[in-house]
Amino acid sequence: MPAGHGQTAMTREQQPPRFTLNCWADAAMASTATTARPTVAFAHLGCEKNRVDTEHMLGLLAQAGYGVSADEADAQVVVVNTCSFIQDARAESVRTLVDLAEQGKQIVIAGCLAQHFQEELLESLPEARAIVGTGDYQHIVEVLEQVEAGERVNRVSQVPTFVADENLPRYRTTSEAVAYLKVAEGCDYRCAFCIIPKLRGDQRSRPIESIVAEAQQLAAQGVKELILISQITTNYGLDLYGKPQLAELLRALGEVEIPWIRVHYAYPTGLTPEVLAAYREVPNVLPYLDLPLQHSHPEVLRAMNRPWQEGVNGQLLQRIREQLPDAVLRTTFIVGYPGETEEQFEHLLEFVQEQRFDHVGVFCFSPEDGTPAADLPNAVPAEVAEARRGRLMEAQQAISAERNGAWVGRIVDVLVEQENPSSGELIGRCLRFAPDVDGEVRIRAGSHGAAASAGTMVPVRITAADIYDLEGEVVGAQEMVDAVRHS
């Protein structure tokens, strides 16, 4: 179930994939390995916040002399960083664990599933040599040393309190030009459907100075897009400074030489005039707002324990569009919440049609044990929830096609990320697309020979659009000048 502070979803929905190490990170880690240590592979499942935890574990193990392989077949030990956010995510995590167990691998279970089930996991899976909680991954080297000594290890703090900083080793698994930066951990909100606070603990923010220091490290590595993440990014700093400090953080990051800064997981009430002013005034902060709204109807929002959102949605969106006319808006919704009536769903459908978001993800309600919503009466039948999801997605697809189509003819900066070696076609993203959850831009060489390569940021004229993606061609200086003169 997508909490406002949980995973984002995309118009073209997908589960976050298990990654393999990219070649530049893999090579860097291989150079640190020694033959005295076993080789370790990672299977990563879950959101980008989980990804950052995995990257820290990779960095710690490489620093300690472990060989880290992108191929599970080459490894004696596989660390599985699991997700337990919704039932489908748990099922995928368990399938991965069972598959690896059947291959005879020694398994270390990390992440949200370990935090959720703890000792029960060790009892259920004899091949599991250790479990590591969401607040304990910084001890991964010590855990593996205990496993090497023949121990079975339970390293799960009952209440997670750890938050990493710029001094904890890290090897990124994203492309060289893109990095996630976790500004806080945990969540103080208690949405009725969400288990994340139980898995991640209460909010704990990093100091602004720590975040800026890590951003500078990433800039030195060639990062061109920095994505700020936490459970509720607009609440950043509340626990540390006594009030939210996102606007101050954005202004500080504006001094770092990274072309794009993107913010994920913004709560509606946190988009204050000060925050919107920072979006508007800091040149490298993208006008991209990720707002997990979850529903529009006041009664459903009250049942979700989000009563503060009533009356905010429409007013907020109007204010955003007034202050940020080029804003790109993405959101997620839950359909089939217990007690959701047809009238309440129609309210949501009309809201989506009226607000015309750029990107929308829709999830059917999934009851999570240990949350208040799991005990609510008047469950909506699964087939009804699926039908509502289909109707909402169908309505949004037409809107997405229209919103993408409005970009045809524009010249925009595109961060090139991939190249098809056989066709030469390049794949990248402009500011309206976040990695993994939104669409992409398919790029051709320009008519005057202007070209690009992976890892660069180039001007592209958008020539075509569909529901999900854009197409375009690289333009040269003369074409950019001509475009300005004729605008």
Curated annotation (Swiss-Prot):
Q: Which SMART domains match?
A: Elp3
Give start and end of each MTTase N-terminal domain.
38-149
Q: Tell me a Gene Ontology molecular-function term this record carries.
A: metal ion binding
Q: Which InterPro entries match?
A: Elp3/MiaA/NifB-like_rSAM, Methylthiotransferase, Methylthiotransferase_CS, Methylthiotransferase_N, Methylthiotransferase_N_sf, NA-bd_OB-fold, Ribosomal_uS12_MeSTrfase_RimO, rSAM
- What is its EC class? transferase
Q: Which cofactors are reported in the record for this sequence?
A: [4Fe-4S] cluster
Q: Which UniProt keywords apply?
A: 4Fe-4S, Cytoplasm, Iron, Iron-sulfur, Metal-binding, S-adenosyl-L-methionine, Transferase
- Name this protein carries in UniProt: Ribosomal protein uS12 methylthiotransferase RimO
Gene designation per UniProt: rimO
